[in-house]
Amino acid sequence: MANMSPTKNPIPEQDPNVRNKNFEEVALGYTVEMAVDEANRCLNCPRPACMSGCPVNVKIPQFIACVREQDFKGAYHKILEDSSLPAICGRVCPQEKQCESKC
């Protein structure tokens, strides 16, 4: 990864005209291709500053490496090593102000 792509993949969301009639998840999540493309943005820093921005101390580079290899089960287990509530943290974490801002 010589240079990180500055362009983030936006997370697909339900259309507002659809979601105003249901209580389903707004964020639809990435496709496999989008997740891998997003993981490929990581620079693999020798001293990853992103981890200093994570209050839960998730091993972000290892998590991203699993996603890059499409090992989503491994990525999930990597997060579980440090966070017992990954689904909740994933919804409320302002990653753009924490880990991503350190990158």
Indicate residue ranges for each PLM-predicted region.
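Ferredoxin-type iron-sulfur electron-transfer modules and their immediate structural context
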Residues: 1-102
